[in-house]
């Protein structure tokens, strides 16, 4: 066990108390939703809120407004118990600046929200939510080779808007994730080995900073801020209102999906990892290893290895690469198909975890040694499982390396440049599940992550924020953290933009 008996008991009491409340929203485990904004909300009068409403081009939603409940919704519902006093639905960049100024004047805590997909609930607040989701617009400039995107655009909006132009900016696969958060935290996608991270394609961004000013950050204008905004994670330096990226042309690509069930799982995983490390940069895969959790009446289930991805080239190359893996064990299912990039994008689309969950991530350099493969598989088999979710224990390996390594770790705030894979594992549950079983699963994921620790490099992906991390600053930002603090102090000296894992103004 990673926690003491006393800690487990306190978790159990928290869970039992939440169950007694019979409210799904009031059921977070020991990282309470209320801690998403620890600053007490000052007593702002209705007149004060009306003042904000009158200054907006958009709309201010308050409790009782028919749109308020829908606007409150976030992906990580374990943090949904925190209810804001107001939600500013920004229509213009000026609205974002107005909200920042008003929050500073009134002392109201706030959070910035675009897609609402913060795994740790950092886009929620008990005060004001500055919501940029309605700021939607995509402008393609073929002559300049750039695309300018408003802050509320998500992956689905973006893909649909640029499809007629046959161009692309490296990005994620979840349709409802906002490009704002994706970019600010680095930005993984299936093409990262070929084109780099999303933040590596960023040319400039407009942002409402703590002073209430709207400024532009680029290599030639406010360069210190631009450095920090490429990997420093969202909500730390201001409210970004637009992003301009360099685009790349698209063409037909090769889509690949494969499944291996049972058999020599360790051998298959090892072969897949080794193949990817040495593969051309044009190949981008996500590999997962799953095992259906046991129940008292079930028999041990076989491991299932899934591979999904794209190759920016011909199918024959993919077949040759996968032949290395099929020498270990033939795939149960295999699909290799050349198709238009837009079709591949649709095939690759998937939602992120939703509801109540806990997620852990880390980076792998090279491949797992035999002991690491054993730990990987034995750990998955040890997961208790939660019946309500028909849970499968899962470990995923996202492609890394390639062009992501071509950028120096200190060239941008995104420090994770030496890895070959991003490792992720997660556990999901329902508020109706037995508290003891939920605790067992949460203890399991901490133990599993600790056991995998010797095979990870110590970093954690800042776009997969994790409130349980003790040394989050080093895990997210590594050697870049002191410079981020310096930039924070220059642009937000009063620490206006703050949340439990926000960049501070001093070390």
What is the predicted function of each stretch?
Residues 2-507:
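Soluble FAD-dependent oxygen oxidases
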